[in-house]
Amino acid sequence: MKSKNLGLVDPNSTSGNNVPRFELNKLGIPDAEQYFGKVVFTGSHENAMLALAQGTVDVAANQWTSDDDSTLAQMLHKSMLKNPDGSPMKKDDFRIIHKSAPIINGPYAYNSDLPEDAKAAIAKAFFDAPAKDKAAFDRLQDGQKKGFHPATTKDWDGTIELIKFVDALRKKKAS
């Protein structure tokens, strides 16, 4: 991929900029701008896929949760990506070359001073939501999540490492 064009989403995107740079660094590419011929921000996850499909970029970073849950899958399902002849592109027209570890979502939290029965009721409401009203839960989660689970601070270790990396990048740019 050296000297090829890289499409990123937005400077403030976690899945479309910060995580890809973090992953590239782990692969021995600490400076994307020096390694790739050109690095462009496409403005959105969808635009990154369009740029890749149209050949504007050779590689693009994007959101990917699973084979069926990604910007690429959503756009292919809606026939938004086209071949030059106008026919819809297929999954086989693309190649996933790297996947990062999952990006953890922000937590739902409650005040630790709440009474224990209130804490238990809140947790139960979240954990029971997918079974109690699946249609409402699917709408709330865009059909992308299976449910909630308790988390610990250890679950955010990767995110903390990412934040430190991004902070170091910003400091390097500023100097």
Give the ranges of each region predicted by the language model:
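Alpha-helical secondary-structure segments
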Residues: K2-S3, K124
